[in-house]
């Protein structure tokens, strides 16, 4: 049996709980950086390795090695009678789930059975964020509740990944208009993804706007800002590294929206001491008086969409909850 977990914490707890089989930690961050469709596998993973290297100050050779070993371990699924996917409801997890469903949908499973554990709450935990909160007994109690992955789930997961990795994000909107019941948390997660596109109001995506609002409200130190962001935007499931990437983007360009002090590497003991201060441009953007993209340009991947230049090709219309052609704004 092979268990695929979305984090080291959950995998460690699962091992201590003596769940039968081997445990593979899925360490990708497919919610961030390029995931273009139509790219050969080797090129795709090289692209991902370069992104992870740039984003998290890693050696590109190390990132490439880790991703290669992860894919090689995944390819050994045929040696197991059952593969159990352990995921959660948030965008971070749902993207990894649909990638894996798409991956398995393209392969002959033979005698291997696919199972899924995917939850958004747990009895007795009021503020449930993820499987990493569970102790050994709690995690073990989920194992008998796993359900066989159906052909409908494989098909929907494959279709969802193809939409996410497309250069045309309207494919996601088309998917959300269909029945997504086989994956009950998918619709909410992908809607949150669409809200990451630059808004008509000020050029900020929802994640950026929420983070900047929290800083403006006095959450200047990262040790206060990060938990406040998690409480404000739990459906994204972003860790500290992903939130820092968003903040760094806001601090760049000819007219930065914030200034940063004491920003140390994320594995440093001093990391939580980083502080942020909103600038006058940041205040103007929050008020809707200025536009972040027009002030600073954009070079950002959202799934398979590469937004670049002095205008965003796609914008999010908050009032109508839909994407629009940014070149017509």
Model-assigned labels for residue ranges:
Residues 1-65:
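A structured, charge-rich N-terminal accessory region that forms the first stable segment of a protein
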Residues 20, 99-114:
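A short alpha->loop->secondary-structure connector
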Residues 56-106:
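Long, hydrophobic/aromatic-enriched structural stretches that serve as scaffold segments
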Residues 116-141:
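Short, conserved secondary-structure transition motifs
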Residues 136-216:
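A conserved mid-domain beta-alpha-beta active-site/ligand-binding segment of alpha/beta enzyme cores
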Residues 209, 230-264:
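Charge-enriched amphipathic alpha-helical scaffolds
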Residues 219-230, 239:
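Short acidic, hydrophobic short linear motifs in intrinsically disordered regions
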Residues 241-244, 256-329:
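Accessory beta->alpha helical hairpin/"wing" motif in late/C-terminal subdomains of nucleic-acid enzymes
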């Amino acid at each position: 049996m092979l268990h695929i977990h979305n984090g080291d914490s959950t995998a460690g707890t699962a091992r201590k709980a003596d769940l039968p089989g081997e445990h593979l930690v899925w360490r990708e961050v497919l919610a961030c950086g390029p995931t273009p469709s139509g790219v050969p596998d080797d090129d795709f993973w090289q692209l991902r390795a370069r992104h992870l290297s740039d984003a998290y100050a890693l050696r590109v050779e190390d990132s490439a090695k880790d991703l290669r070993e992860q894919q090689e371990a995944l390819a050994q699924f045929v040696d197991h009678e059952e593969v159990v996917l352990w995921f959660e409801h948030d965008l971070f997890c749902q993207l990894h789930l649909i990638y894996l469903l798409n991956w398995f949908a393209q392969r002959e499973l033979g005698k291997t059975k696919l199972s899924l554990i995917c939850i958004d709450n747990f009895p007795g935990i009021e503020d449930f964020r993820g499987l990493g909160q569970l102790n050994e007994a709690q995690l073990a109690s989920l194992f008998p509740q796993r359900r066989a992955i159906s052909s409908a789930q494989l098909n929907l997961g494959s279709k969802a990944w193809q939409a996410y990795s497309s250069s045309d994000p309207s494919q996601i909107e088309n998917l959300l208009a269909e029945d997504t019941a086989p994956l009950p948390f998918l619709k909410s997660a992908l809607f949150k993804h669409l809200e990451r596109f630059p808004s008509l109001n000020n050029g900020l995506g929802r994640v950026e706007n929420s983070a900047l609002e929290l800083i403006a409200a006095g959450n200047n130190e990262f040790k206060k800002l990060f938990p406040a962001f998690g409480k404000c935007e739990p459906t994204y499931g972003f860790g500290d590294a992903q939130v820092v990437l968003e903040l760094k983007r806001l601090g760049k360009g000819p007219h930065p929206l914030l200034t940063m002090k004491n920003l140390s590497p994320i594995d440093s003991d001093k990391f939580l001491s980083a502080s942020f201060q909103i600038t006058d441009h940041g205040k103007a953007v929050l008020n809707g008086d200025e536009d972040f993209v027009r002030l600073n340009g954009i070079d950002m991947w959202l799934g398979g969409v590469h937004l670049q230049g002095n205008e965003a090709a796609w914008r999010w219309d908050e009032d109508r909850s839909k994407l629009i052609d940014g070149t017509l704004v």
